[in-house]
Amino acid sequence: MQKYVQVRVFKDVPRSEEEYKMMMETIPDMIKKVYDANDYILTYLIDDEIVKGDVYVAPYGKQSRIVAVEREADESDIKPEINYRPLTRKIDNILER
């Protein structure tokens, strides 16, 4: 069953799965600081269990972005006129490193 989830969107860096993995190998503390300072939240659909800190590739306009799960969305976060898109694939959990 699909659920709505709130995610933190990495707008500038990392911009791809490859860039995320490279940065987590070389400068993981910087990625965690970017995550902690990030307040750009969007809502997506998810089929998986909602686990805070799970990192996914997500559609973002005509591109994709790296996002980290924050929490399950409240009903007040969901607008019926918006067509929410599902997260593409899980790649990591930023809080378990």
Label the model's feature ranges.
Residues E25:
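Extended active-site and interfacial segments that coordinate phosphate-rich ligands
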